[in-house]
């Protein structure tokens, strides 16, 4: 009976304060964030297409690891798609953005997310579909980011360190914007 109790206690110790498994960060001291160097309208194939774009730009810049877009649809929030990390989120040059996931979704960040995968400064708005708490904007999402003609979607801005980094405006889906990409 005692060995089972020890195993149960060890399992409890493997969880961080938020109740998520801290093993997801094993061997990783930080997760990198960049903004795409290209712009696209609201039709980029949904979250899968956005993730593909992030992976492609990371690979072209020789960044190791898996990168996904900071992009929510009404049915698929970033809080369910992305790793909720307990390590810091940083720009590709090492600039601190947030101490961990909870800090990332608290309504403010430490620096603007304005560097692309090659450390070039980029400006402008960014498709997110994501509120500051990591939940999806429920009013519209360019039909799951598969349409450039129907509706609007939430965007953030690369210039902001407050909640506007992810929730700044709701432009038409025909607008060409960037994406944020986060290492998983």
Description of each model-found segment:
Residues 16-184:
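Secreted/extracellular ectodomain signature
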Residues 11-14:
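C-terminal motif of bacterial Sec signal peptides marking the signal peptidase cleavage site
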Residues 1-8:
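Sec-dependent signal peptide recognition
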């Amino acid at each position: 009976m005692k060995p089972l109790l020890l195993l149960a206690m060890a399992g409890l110790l493997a969880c961080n304060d938020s109740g998520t498994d801290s093993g997801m960060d094993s061997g990783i001291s930080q997760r990198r964030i960049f903004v795409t160097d290209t712009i696209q309208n609201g039709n980029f194939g949904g979250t899968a297409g956005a993730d593909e774009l992030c992976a492609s730009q990371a690979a072209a810049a020789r960044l190791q690891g898996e990168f996904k877009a900071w992009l929510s649809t009404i049915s698929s929030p970033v809080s369910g798609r992305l790793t909720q990390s307990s390590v810091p989120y940083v720009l590709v040059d090492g600039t601190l953005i947030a101490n961990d996931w909870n800090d990332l979704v608290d309504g403010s960040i430490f620096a603007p997310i304005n560097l692309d995968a090659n450390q070039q400064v980029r400006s402008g708005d960014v498709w997110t579909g994501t509120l500051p708490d990591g939940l999806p904007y429920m009013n519209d999402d360019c039909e799951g980011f598969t349409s450039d003609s129907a509706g609007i979607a939430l965007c953030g801005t690369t210039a902001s360190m407050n909640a506007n980094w992810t929730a700044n405006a709701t432009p038409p889906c025909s607008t060409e914007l960037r994406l944020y990409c986060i290492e998983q």
